[in-house]
Curated annotation (Swiss-Prot):
Organism of derivation: Shewanella sp. (strain MR-4)
PANTHER family found in the cross-reference section: UROCANATE HYDRATASE
Its biological purpose: Catalyzes the conversion of urocanate to 4-imidazolone-5-propionate.
Presence of the UniProt keyword Lyase in the record: yes
Cofactor-binding details, from the entry: Binds 1 NAD(+) per subunit.
Catalytic-site annotation from UniProt: 410
Record's keyword terms, sorted: Cytoplasm, Histidine metabolism, Lyase, NAD
Cofactor requirements of the protein: NAD(+)
GO annotation, cellular component aspect: cytoplasm
Record: residues binding NAD(+): 52-53, 130, 176-178, 196, 201, 242-243, 263-267, 273-274, 322, 492
Name of the protein: Urocanate hydratase
Length: 556
C-alpha cells in the first residue's frame, strides 16, 4: 500500500477570519499547505503531488495529518522542523523566529542524483519538494504567469520590434508550470501551440481559462493558429500530442514558428517526460518494473526534441530554454550542441534580477477575492508611474481565474517589496481587508537560487554553480523574522542541478508584523542585488549604491 495515495482525500483550506490554530502565524502555514492540495491547485492532490513531476507538499498522508495537528497546537514561541515533508521536531525559539523551518530533497553533492534520490523516495526517506510545492506557497499556474509574460514581452522586443501580433510560439507541456505559457503568450500578443500528452491537463487548463482551444491533430492545431494570426486575435491551442513528435514533424514539413521553447517536466526523465510512441499507461507500468528503460527512452525522445529546436533555430525561430533542463538531458544523450540556444534568464530576465525584481506574490487567507482586488488597487496607488505593471494587474484581474485561495503575483523589486507589504499590513490593521495576507515568492528569484542551467546560467564572473548564495538567503530570512523559510535542492531542473530557498511572511496587522515584513522584504531582495553586484553587474552595483546597501567589497 502506497501511503502517499489516498483518492478519498479532498483538501480545502479554511476561509474567513476564524482561527483553527493559536494565531495567524500558525494558521497561515496550515492554510497554505492545505491550499497547495486544493483540487483546483494541485496536479494530483490524491498523491500529494502539487506540480512539477513529483513535487509534493508532504511526504505521505500520515505526515500531512501530523503537520496539521502540530500547527494547530504550535505556540508563538515554537518552531516546527520539517525534513523532506515529514514533521520531525518542535523546538522553543522566540516570537520573531520562523514558526516553520523546512528542508526538502537535500543530498550531499556526491549523491545528489535522481538514482539515489529515487531509492530514498521509494523507502519513504525523502520527498521531492520542487520549489513551492514543499514550501507551501504554490498559488496555481498564476505563480509563473507574469514571469513567463515578462519573458515573452522581452522576446517580442528583442526579435520583433515589440510587435507580437501575427506571431506564434511553439512549446510543450501544460502542467502546473508549463500551463502558464499559453495564457502568458496570448497576454503578450502571441498565439501559442502547446503540445501535451495528458488530455486531462489540457482539459484542466481549458477549465481554468489558461488554454483557449483543444486540438487532436497537428493540422487542426495549425489551422487554428493560422486563423488567429489572420484575424489579428491571438489564440492558445492545447494539442494532444508528444512534443518530440510535433517539433520534429514541423522541421520535416519546413514550418518554422516565430518562437520555440519547452516546459515539459524534462527535469525528471523517470516521472516527468513521456517517451515517443509510449502511452501514459505503458509508462506507468514500466516505472514499476524497469526504471532505467524509462529514463533511457525519455532522454532519447528529449534528444529528438532538442535537435528539432536547434533545427528550428537555424531556420530562424527565436529559440530559448525555459528552465526545465531539457538541454542537459539531450546533451547527455549525444546532442553536443544542445546549449547553442540560450536559457531565458541570461537572455531576457537577468537585468530585472540585478535590481532585486522578481516574483512577489500574496494570498488572501480570507478566501475573499475582494481582498486581492483591494491590494491590486493599493499596488497601483503606491507605484503610480509604472504603466507596464498597471497593465499587468488589469490583465490579471480580467483573465486569470483564481485557483484555491485568491492570490496575485507581480514582479517588483528591492525598491517596492517592503513598502507594499507594510501597506498590506496596515490594510489588515484598519479593517480594509477581511483577514491577514501572506506574502511569498517563487524560489526562482534574484538571490535565492543557484542553478547553472537556469537562474545562474552564464554569470559574468563564472560563479554559476556557487550555492552559498541561497544558503545565505535562507539564513538571513530566518534571522530577519520570516514566518516560514525553506531550503530545497533540485527544483526546476532536477537532482544535482540546483539549490534554492523560499520565504513566506504573514501580514496580520500587528506592529510586530510591520517590523518583521520591513526587515524580511527588504533583506530578501537585497540579497539578490548583493549576489549580482558581487558577480560584477553594473546594474546591480548601481542599485546597491542607490539603495544604500552595505556591501563591504563593493568599491566606490
Amino acid at each position: 500500500m502506497d501511503k502517499r495515495h489516498d483518492p478519498s482525500r479532498r483538501i480545502i483550506a479554511p476561509h474567513g477570519s476564524q482561527l483553527s490554530c493559536k494565531s495567524w502565524l500558525t494558521e497561515a502555514p496550515m492554510r497554505m499547505l492545505m491550499n497547495n492540495l486544493h483540487p483546483d491547485v494541485a496536479e494530483r492532490p490524491e498523491d500529494l503531488v502539487v506540480y512539477g513531476g513529483i513535487g509534493r507538499a508532504a511526504r505521505d498522508w500520515d505526515c500531512y495529518d501530523k503537520i496539521i495537528e502540530v500547527l494547530k497546537r504550535l505556540e508563538d514561541d515554537e518552531t516546527l522542523m520539517v525534513q523532506s515533508g515529514k514533521p520531525v521536531g518542535v523546538f522553543r525559539t522566540h516570537a520573531d523566529a520562523p514558526r516553520v523551518l523546512i528542508a526538502n530533497s537535500n543530498l550531499v553533492p556526491h549523491w545528489a542524483n535522481w538514482e539515489h534520490f529515487n531509492e530514498l523516495d521509494k523507502q519513504g526517506l525523502a520527498m521531492y519538494g520542487q520549489m513551492t510545492a514543499g514550501s507551501w506557497i504554490y498559488i496555481g499556474t498564476q505563480g509563473i504567469v507574469q514571469g513567463t509574460y515578462e519573458t515573452f514581452v522581452a522576446v517580442a522586443k528583442q526579435h520583433f520590434g515589440g510587435v507580437a501580433a501575427g506571431k506564434w510560439i511553439l512549446t510543450g507541456g501544460l502542467g502546473g508550470m508549463g500551463g502558464a505559457q499559453t495564457l502568458a503568450g496570448t497576454m503578450a500578443g502571441f498565439s501559442v501551440l502547446a503540445c501535451e500528452v495528458d488530455e486531462t491537463r489540457i482539459d484542466f487548463r481549458l477549465r481554468t481559462r489558461y488554454v483557449d482551444k483543444k486540438a487532436t491533430s497537428l493540422d487542426e492545431a495549425l489551422a487554428m493558429i493560422n486563423d488567429a494570426n489572420a484575424s489579428g486575435k491571438p489564440v492558445s491551442v492545447g494539442l494532444l500530442a508528444n512534443a518530440a513528435d510535433i517539433f520534429a514533424e514541423l522541421v520535416k514539413r519546413g514550418i518554422t514558428p516565430d518562437v520555440v521553447t519547452d516546459q515539459t517536466s524534462a527535469h525528471d526523465p523517470l516521472n516527468g517526460y513521456l517517451p515517443q510512441g509510449w502511452t501514459m499507461a505503458q509508462a506507468a507500468d514500466m516505472r514499476k518494473t524497469d526504471e532505467a528503460a524509462v529514463v533511457k527512452a525519455a532522454k532519447a525522445s528529449m534528444a529528438v526534441q532538442v535537435q528539432a529546436m536547434l533545427d528550428l533555430q537555424a531556420a530562424g525561430a527565436a529559440t530559448l530554454d525555459y528552465g526545465n533542463n531539457i538541454r542537459q538531458m539531450a546533451f547527455e544523450t549525444g546532442v553536443k550542441n544542445a546549449f547553442d540556444f540560450p536559457g531565458f534568464v541570461p537572455a531576457y530576465i537577468r537585468p530585472l534580477f540585478c535590481e532585486g525584481i522578481g516574483p512577489f506574490r500574496w494570498v488572501a487567507l480570507s478566501g475573499d477575492p475582494e481582498d486581492i482586488y483591494k491590494t491590486d488597487a493599493k499596488v497601483k496607488e503606491l507605484i503610480p508611474d509604472n504603466p507596464h505593471l498597471h497593465n499587468w494587474l488589469d490583465m490579471a484581474r480580467e483573465r486569470i481565474a483564481f485557483q484555491g485561495l485568491p492570490a496575485r503575483i507581480c514582479w517588483v523589486g528591492l525598491k517596492d517589496r517592503a513598502r507594499l507589504a507594510q501597506a498590506f499590513n496596515e490594510m489588515v490593521k484598519n479593517g480594509e481587508l477581511s483577514a491577514p495576507i501572506v506574502i511569498g515568492r517563487d524560489h526562482l528569484d534574484s538571490g535565492s537560487v543557484a542553478s547553472p542551467n537556469r537562474e545562474t546560467e552564464s554569470m559574468m564572473d563564472g560563479s554559476d554553480a556557487v550555492s552559498d548564495w541561497p544558503l545565505l538567503n535562507a539564513l538571513l530570512n530566518t534571522a530577519s523574522g520570516a514566518t516560514w523559510v525553506s531550503l530545497h535542492h533540485g527544483g526546476g531542473v532536477g537532482m544535482g542541478f540546483s539549490q534554492h530557498s523560499g520565504v513566506v511572511i504573514v501580514c496580520d496587522g500587528t506592529e510586530a508584523a510591520a517590523k518583521r515584513v520591513g526587515r524580511v522584504l527588504w533583506n530578501d531582495p537585497a540579497t539578490g542585488v548583493m549576489r549580482h553586484a558581487d558577480a560584477g553587474y553594473e546594474i546591480a552595483k548601481n542599485c546597491a549604491k542607490e539603495q544604500g546597501l552595505d556591501l563591504p567589497m563593493l568599491k566606490d
